[in-house]
Amino acid sequence: MLLPKRVKYRRQHRPKTTGRSKGGNYVTFGEFGLQATTTSWITSRQIESARIAMTRYMKRGGKVWIKIFPHTPYTKKPLEVRMGAGKGAVEGWIAVVKPGRILFEVAGVSEEVAREALRLASHKLPVKTKFVKREELGGETNES
């Protein structure tokens, strides 16, 4: 699973989940990508589950790029504990995904294989997504 090697502060405030993604909106490394159309937190376990689903379908052919990283810790207090008495312990790590963000990129396989692999990965994620292709001049074309 993905998590930072070290952080300056162990616990953080919850991140903002409004607006569109500022960066990472174009397919840059691969030929095809999976683009988010809604906002959500994605945990490191969900990212790993989506990666496994893609690589198994592609039978280890081609290359996969994970374009998001769970930098932000989220905390949780134990069950049946009263309010107060400090912030809870770190439960896991999340990546905040906003609309327009490319989550995964794939190269080295046909479009049909890439489309199905990214569809399987999208079922593991809590965001709505769409399949995008890379253009020659650096951008991407939006295809549903």
Swiss-Prot record:
Record field: transmembrane: none
Keywords: Ribonucleoprotein, Ribosomal protein, RNA-binding, rRNA-binding, tRNA-binding
PANTHER family: 50S/60S RIBOSOMAL PROTEIN L16 (PTHR12220), LARGE RIBOSOMAL SUBUNIT PROTEIN UL16M (PTHR12220:SF13)
Family that this chain belongs to: Belongs to the universal ribosomal protein uL16 family.
Protein name according to UniProt: Large ribosomal subunit protein uL16
Positions with biased composition (Basic residues): 1-19
Single Gene Ontology MF annotation: rRNA binding
General function of this protein: Binds 23S rRNA and is also seen to make contacts with the A and possibly P site tRNAs.
InterPro entries: Ribosomal_uL16 (IPR047873), Ribosomal_uL16_bact-type (IPR000114), Ribosomal_uL16_CS (IPR020798), Ribosomal_uL16_dom (IPR016180), Ribosomal_uL16_sf (IPR036920)
GO annotation, cellular component aspect: cytosolic large ribosomal subunit
